[in-house]
Amino acid sequence: MNRRNFVKQQLAVSAVAALGPLGMYAGSSSRDAQAEKQQAGFNLKYAPHLGMFRHHAGDNPIDQLKFMADQGFTAFEDNGMKHRDKSLQEKMARTMEQNQIEMGVFVAHEISWSKPNLTSGDQDLREKFLKEIKESVEVAKRVNAKWVTVVPGFEDLRLDIQFQTAHVVESLKRAAEILEPHGIVMVLEPLNFMNHPGLFLKESPQAYQICKSVDSPSCKILFDI
C-alpha cells in the first residue's frame, strides 16, 4: 500500500495518533514534498504537533516538520512555541514557509490551572497577562502566526460569577487592543470540567457571551469539540 495513501485513510478512519508503521522516512526536496502533498489531498487543514511523528522522523523539530509536509499536512500547531529559543522559532518558520505549512495556534500566556488570575480582578495579575500577550505578538510575527490561544484560568470561588466575568472581559478588552493592530486573533478555549475541574471557562455559550462583550475582531472562540 502506498505510504501516503495509508496515512490519509487512517486519519479519516480513526485519528492521526493511530497511524500504523509508515516505513523509513527519507527527506525530499521542497518541490517533491509539495507535489506529494498535493497528491495526498486532505480535505481539511489538519494541524499535527511536535512529537506525533517522532518515531518516524526523529526528535528534531525541523525533521518532524518536513515529515509532516511529506505526508500532505498543510498546517501545524505548537502550544509551546512561545517558550522555544528564538533561533529555533526562526528555523521552524523558514521550514514551514519552504514547505507551505501554515502556522496554527500557540498558547499566548501562562495558564493558571489552580489559582484565580484574570477572574480575580487583581491588577498585578492582569498586567502580567498583558505583558505576556505583548511578548506573544513578537513570537507570532516571527513564526507567521495569526491565532493565539487564551485560557482565562481558574475560577475565583470568593466572587460571584458575574463579577468574575466582568474581570475577564476587561482583561480581554485590553489584550484585544494590543492584538488588533497586528491582525492577531486570540481564541478562547472552553475546557470541560471533567478533565479540567475548576477552570472558569467551561462552555461554548459562555465563551460566546464573553466574545460579544469584548466586541473585537481579535477575540474569538477556539471551538475544540
Question: Where do the model's predicted regions map?
Answer:
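Amphipathic, soluble alpha/beta structural segments
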Residues: 100, 158-161, 187, 222
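Alpha-helix N-cap and loop-to-helix initiation/capping positions
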Residues: 120-131, 159-170, 195-206
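Residues at structural and domain junctions
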Residues: 34, 78, 115, 154, ...
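N-terminal pre-domain/capping segments
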Residues: 2-146, 173, 180, 216-222
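Acidic/histidine-rich catalytic cores of soluble enzymes
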Residues: 75-76, 169-225
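Short amphipathic alpha-helical leader/targeting segments
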Residues: 20-21, 62, 154, 162, ...
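Active-site groove signature of glycoside hydrolases
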Residues: 140-159, 185-193
